[in-house]
Amino acid sequence: MPPTLIVDPASVDLSQVVADREAIRRVNPQRYELEQLTAIVLMDGEQHLIAGYKDVGAEEFWVRGHLPDYPLLPGVLICEAAAQLCSYYIVSTGLLQGDFLGFGGLENVRFRSPVRPGDRLLLIGKGTRMNRRQTIFNVQGFVGATMVFHGDILGVPLHRQEDEPAQEV
C-alpha cells in the first residue's frame, strides 16, 4: 500500500517555475549527465516542502544500455534526482552549514512503477529533520497521478576544499 501523500501531485502547478535549470545550477554542483532536475516548482519554508520535476529524455546516457528494448530510468537516478531536490532546498534556504548537501543514505525506498523516456517525473520532498549534521527528507515521485517512488533521503553537509586532494576511505 502506498504511503500517505505529502502533497497531492494534482495540486502542484508545474507552470509556476520557481527555479529553472540555470537557477538550479547556481545552487547545486552537479553538471552534465548527473544534472537530474529540470525545474523547481514549489518551495514552502514554513512546512519545509519542495517540489520539482525531471523531464526524462530519450537521449539520456542510460537509455541505450538500461534495458534497450524497454528503457527504464534507473532507480539510482530517481534517488539522485530526489537527493538533488533536497539539496537545493537546504542550500537555497540557508539551513546548511556547508557548501552543498551530500548523499548520506536512503531508507524505506520503494519503486512502484517504471519511469520511461518521455515521462515527467514530479518529485516532492518534505524535510522531517534538519540540523547542522544531518537532514532527513521524506520524498515521493509521481508520473501523472501515479506514485512511482517513495522513501527517505538522508543528507550531510559537505565543504568543498579545493586545495586538498581527496582522501581514501
Set out the residue ranges of the language-model regions.
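Hydrophobic core residues within well-ordered beta-strands of beta-rich domains
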Residues: 34-36, 121, 135
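Flexible, low-complexity linker/boundary loops enriched in proline and small hydrophobic residues
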Residues: 2-42, 155, 164-169
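Mixed-charge, glycine-accented linear interaction segment located at domain edges/termini
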Residues: 129-130, 134-168
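Compact, glycine-rich, soluble single-domain proteins
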Residues: 64-74, 79-88, 103
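Hydrophobic beta-strand-centered segment that forms part of the acyl-chain substrate-binding groove
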Residues: 2, 9-18, 86-124, 148-150, ...
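Catalytic strand-loop segment that frames the active site of acyl-thioester-processing enzymes
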Residues: 30-73
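Residue-level recognition of beta-strand microenvironments
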Residues: 43-45, 114, 128-130, 156
